[in-house]
């Protein structure tokens, strides 16, 4: 089947339903593409990226105030912006920004794995296995996770563990939110 308006609608629905659940929207999109045999799968990657950019846009709109504050705090940390007269630093926001940076650092080496991971997007069996693995990971986190740590009790090593989980979740079918939530609970 060539890519059509109907298949694009299906993909938009999958993306919209799956993105914020711990079920790997990318994995579900790949399964849908493999199942429907939509055109040249390599050409579909651009459409998938656009779907994810649309989701990112929605997140930016929903959290624009917090994101603006994080950006402002980051610029002040780098001394690229002076605080307004009478304004004071925001230690909780600065702490959150530091944790976000630490949790993002493990993704840098993952960027170089693209050539190895790309073929897995075409392997429906592998993606299905990874989706099941995400389910077991969530079950383990629910059963064995401590889950009682507050934001104030979080440490840099916790942020790093969440970042490492995020790095592992670049594997097609593993849910980034599912793995990071599980890492945070365990």
Task: Give the ranges of each region predicted by the language model.
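Single conserved hydrophobic/aromatic residue that forms the stacking wall/gate
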Residues: 1-6, 10
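Context-gated lysine
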Residues: 2, 81-84, 149-152
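Membrane-embedded helical hairpins/re-entrant loop segments and their flanking transmembrane helices
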Residues: 7, 14, 18, 28-36, ...
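Extended aliphatic helical segments
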Residues: 9, 14, 49, 59, ...
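Membrane helix-loop-helix hairpins that form the core translocation module of multi-pass transporters
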Residues: 34-143
């Amino acid at each position: 089947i060539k890519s059509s308006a109907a298949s694009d609608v299906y993909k938009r629905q999958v993306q919209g339903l799956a993105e914020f659940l711990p079920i790997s929207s990318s994995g579900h999109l790949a399964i849908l593409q493999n199942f429907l045999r939509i055109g040249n799968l390599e050409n579909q990657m651009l459409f998938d990226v656009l779907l994810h950019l649309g989701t990112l846009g929605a997140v930016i709109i929903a959290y624009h105030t917090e994101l603006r504050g994080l950006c402002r705090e980051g610029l002040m940390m780098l001394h690229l912006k002076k605080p307004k007269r009478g304004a004071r630093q925001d230690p909780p926001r600065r702490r959150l920004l530091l944790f976000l940076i630490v949790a993002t650092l493990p993704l840098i080496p993952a960027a170089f794995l693209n050539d190895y991971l790309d073929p897995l997007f075409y392997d429906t069996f592998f993606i299905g296995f990874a989706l099941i693995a995400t389910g077991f990971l969530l079950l383990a986190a629910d059963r064995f996770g401590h889950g009682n740590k507050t934001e104030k009790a979080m440490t840099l090593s916790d942020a790093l563990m969440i970042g490492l989980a995020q790095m592992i979740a670049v594997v097609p079918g593993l849910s980034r939110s599912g793995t990071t939530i599980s890492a945070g609970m365990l």
